[in-house]
Amino acid sequence: MTELSPKYNPAEVEAGRYQKWLDADVFKPSGDQKAKPYSIVIPPPNVTGKLHLGHAWDTTLQDIIIRQKRMQGFDTLWLPGMDHAGIATQAKVEERLREQGISRYDLGRDKFLDKVWEWKDEYATTIKEQWGKMGLSVDYSRERFTLDEGLSKAVRKVFVDLYKKGWIYRGEFIINWDPAARTALSDIEVVHKDVEGAFYHMNYMLEDGSRALQVATTRPETMFGDVAVAVNPEDPRYKDLIGKHVLLPIVNKLIPIVGDEHADPEFGTGVVKITPAHDPNDFEVGQRHNLPQVNVMNDDGTMNELAGDFAGMDRFEARQATVAKLEELGALVNIEKRVHSVGHSERSGAVVEPRLSTQWFVKMDELAKQAMDNQETDDRVDFYPPRFNDTFLQWMENVHDWVISRQLWWGHQIPAWYNAEGEIYVGEEAPEGDGWTQDEDVLDTWFSSALWPFSTMGWPDTDSEDFKRYFPTSTLVTGYDIIFFWVSRMIFQSLEFTERQPFQNVLIHGLIRDEEGRKMSKSLGNGIDPMDVIEKYGADSLRWFLSNGSAPGQDVRFSYEKMDASWNFINKIWNISRYILMNNEGLTLEEAESNVAKVAASEAGNVTDQWILHNLNETIAKVTENFDKFEFGVAGHILYNFIWEEFANWYVELTKEVLYSDNEAEKVITRSVLLYTLDKILRLLHPIMPFVTEEIYAQYAQGSIVTAAYPTVTPAFENEAAHKGVESLKDFIRAVRNARAEVNVAPSKPITILVKTADSELEDFFNSNINYIKRFTNPEKLEISSAIAAPELAMTSIITGAEIYLPLADLLNVEEELARLDKELAKWQKELDMVGKKLGNERFVANAKPEVVQKEKDKQADYQAKYDATQERIVEMHKLVK
């Protein structure tokens, strides 16, 4: 047995430990076919950069689950991997190239992809280093990447099979277009923001010049693509105009007036300009009336030749130029400033442009119905917390067809080929013969991610060992912000292609926020690098904070104050472990277990030993129960209270009565209970704080705590009598301590303690444990009896079954104490007067910085609280001498 360092140093504790675990292969599945399998696939992080605090939280929760299940004897697999993250990664690489004055088009597709693979290798290495520093117990022998050949094969099969069923189709529709990334986006890749904008009101003159129809738009630059104006066929103001024409300003082209219910008589003038190539509602109107589709923009957001003199202008530049021209022509009625919601690309931040485009889509109605129906069966996915099942169902009910093609080079190239005759071939392999050209677009990243739980297990080879043993997976851990992006798609793809749920449980966590409750973001500059936190506090402290503040579905606020508390808790564990091991005298864990069995059988030990084992039993039961419900925060609070309050503050202190005695037999038993309880504590804590628990465990045990058995309840430890007795003993000691503190009597001063109880069992218990009472209360005189008479002047504390009297004559001189309190009251009044004068100065309040004023207000509140407490103490003292 070696000795723990005098001071807890997380850098020393954690250095090299992860590599030792990897070298020992302790993270791989046990291979025990008799054991029940338990599997998790890691939500693959994007290879776009370093991991953030949200990733740290997400992976910590997974590691807690898998470490506990491993210790419980499950055949565990935690499969790691990363996502190619098409648009995000390509944007990063293009940004790096732009700094060198190079575009992807300068390189060409193949050389550009070489650059992206270099990026992927660089950041994949960084991510794995971060996983190591976090202590994640993943099985690297099964590491996957969404562009691996095995996963690519699965992607091609799914695409081809859905195409053959008619559930993947190619069509021309209005989609969300990112002009910066030059690619289509799905609805959920669009972030809507309220921005300052305007409604531009314009007059379109009837062809005979008799009157004008007023239309309004937020995007006047699209008017070059107007092909009609629409009015409601039931609107009496305009129904006679249906079939006539108006003159499109600037372009001087006649366009028809159509009757369509899309035009709302109650909104604006009731007249709507129709631009089928640039608005989804207008597209549908165009379909109903067989209108042409005129696209007036290039894919980079500039105007094309159909915009006439405005060709080549950026769309926003063209907006201002168009408005100026309309004003010059007298066609601009007015500009109405208004805040409105505008879609932005989640990745590039560019304003999204609704644009007519030929894309590939997944038909969603049958897939969504299948997913919703499955939630009514025994094979349903259980959400934690359950309310997210409703969220999932609502999204599925309102789902649109999914645009899956992206105008990128990085990703799974669509397995479709075209020839000069206009034929399309879709297959897992390229068609035979010459003259075929593969579609240049790639699939949406989420298309391959949706297959992650089963493609990583070897599917479409359903005979693969991993697929047969570990699929469906057991639990998915993810944030509520990607339930629709990812969770729902995994569910419907898994049901379609494996006829099974992808996972049994989904644990939903919230977001990491800063101390003020704001979402962490680059724009706010409030992001926290988890590696910086680990460098200062250690991985275990970060993991304890992340788990201890965790409740399913809830957000967590990060603060350094909480990190300090986490470090302090681990330091406490370190110190009590060091104390126990230094007093261990060579006792082995096996010997301790044998001696503890004697305590449970009441053959050895004392009531405090029985009490701590009883409470340990309860702690094991409650922690295990809450782990099973993914209530890690609740489990953490239970552990914290048991370790710090019951074990360290009480039991360890109580054992000093034995350890400092001459009774060698009792010492052995006490050391045994200390070591045994410490061992169980470390095992309970290990899933949350793996490094420090391994370091301490290695001081007294063989092997790794990673594969040590997780604690279970021992029925023989149940002892309500011991529990009740020691709790009464604690109440007694607390009552005396509180009374001393109330009248400022030092613990070192001996006092008289009189205890009156009519409970003979309690009297016997106190008398039989008189040494503990004396050690913790320091009495000069101690009497415990049913015949005690209450002194005339005494502090009285009532506990269950007894009254405790502390005669005032032993405690203090009341007159002197009142004089001292009067002085203290005057001091706080003086402080209140000073700060009150400052805050009463209007010039100070008006001119000082807000934080300075707030500091004075905080002082005032603090002084007032101290004044009130002192005054209350004076009142209590007067009561005592009446």
From Swiss-Prot:
Subcellular location: Cytoplasm
Coiled coil: 808-877
Highest taxon of the lineage: Bacteria
Reactions performed catalytically: tRNA(Val) + L-valine + ATP = L-valyl-tRNA(Val) + AMP + diphosphate
HAMAP family: Val_tRNA_synth_type1
Predominant place of localization: cytoplasm
Listed InterPro entries: aa-tRNA-synth_I_CS, aa-tRNA-synth_Ia, Anticodon_Ia_Val, M/V/L/I-tRNA-synth_anticd-bd, Rossmann-like_a/b/a_fold, tRNA-bd_arm, tRNAsynth_Ia_anticodon-bd, Val-tRNA_synth_C_sf
Gene of this entry: valS
Identification of the protein by name: Valine--tRNA ligase
Residues bound to ATP: 522
One GO-annotated biological process of the protein: valyl-tRNA aminoacylation
